[in-house]
């Protein structure tokens, strides 16, 4: 990455991920104007527990003018917890196929999606079609559905490059279609 870059991209993986699903998306969105980071975290822990460490890493970066966070699945939960944490820097938070209304996370971790966001933060939800998403299609509800007025919501199509657009392919589709300018 360019050492003088004023913009950063932070990718945050989901549960039980080794990160392979991020190779194509990060190659697609990485450019000479940004520094790109992949944040690894222990997904056996509640997402709230890693926010102080992630925030410390972000705030330690100097002269940053724009932050773009891309969180997939449980990584989207982590990303959502930054909505009220980053101040004074233009920030985009993109949650991709994220179980923001997960009853399990609420039950075991006390997770509740934030109800507000800072004014410098733009929030984007990229939702898969539940019946095509093997992480969600066995549930009796769609864990992606939350009511957050200050967000832009996009429903992904049913196919990507001729294949079913499910949970993991959602990151690649977003990488091909996102506008990071």
Where are these regions (language model features)?
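Flexible, membrane-associating and regulatory peripheral segments of lipid-active enzymes
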Residues: 1-10, 16-19, 34-37, 57-60, ...
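Serine-dependent carboxylesterase/thioesterase catalytic core
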Residues: 9, 29, 41-44, 48-134
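Generic preference for hydrophobic/aromatic residues in regular secondary structure cores
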Residues: 9, 35-36, 62-64, 82, ...
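Alpha-helical and His/Cys-centered functional microenvironments
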Residues: 17, 76, 171
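The serine-hydrolase catalytic nucleophile loop
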Residues: 19-25
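A short, Lys/Arg-enriched amphipathic alpha-helix followed by its capping loop at the start of a domain
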Residues: 25-34
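C-terminal catalytic-base region of ester-bond hydrolases, centering on the histidine
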Residues: 112-181
């Amino acid at each position: 990455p360019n050492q003088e870059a004023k913009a950063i991209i932070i990718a945050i993986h989901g549960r039980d991920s080794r990160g392979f699903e991020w190779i194509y998306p990060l190659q697609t969105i990485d450019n000479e104007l940004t520094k790109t980071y992949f944040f690894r975290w222990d997904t056996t822990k509640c997402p709230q527990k890693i926010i102080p460490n992630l925030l410390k890493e972000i705030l330690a970066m100097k002269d940053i003018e724009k932050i773009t966070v891309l969180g997939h699945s449980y990584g989207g939960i982590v990303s959502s917890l930054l909505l009220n944490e980053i101040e004074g820097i233009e920030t985009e938070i993109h949650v991709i196929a994220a179980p923001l209304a997960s009853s399990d996370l609420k039950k075991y971790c006390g997770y509740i999606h934030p109800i507000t966001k800072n004014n410098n933060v733009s929030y984007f939800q990229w939702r898969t079609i539940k019946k095509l998403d093997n992480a969600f299609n066995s549930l009796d509800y769609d864990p992606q559905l939350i009511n957050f007025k200050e967000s832009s919501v996009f429903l992904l199509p049913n196919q990507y490059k001729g294949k079913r657009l499910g949970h993991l392919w959602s990151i690649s589709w977003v990488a091909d279609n996102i506008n990071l300018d």
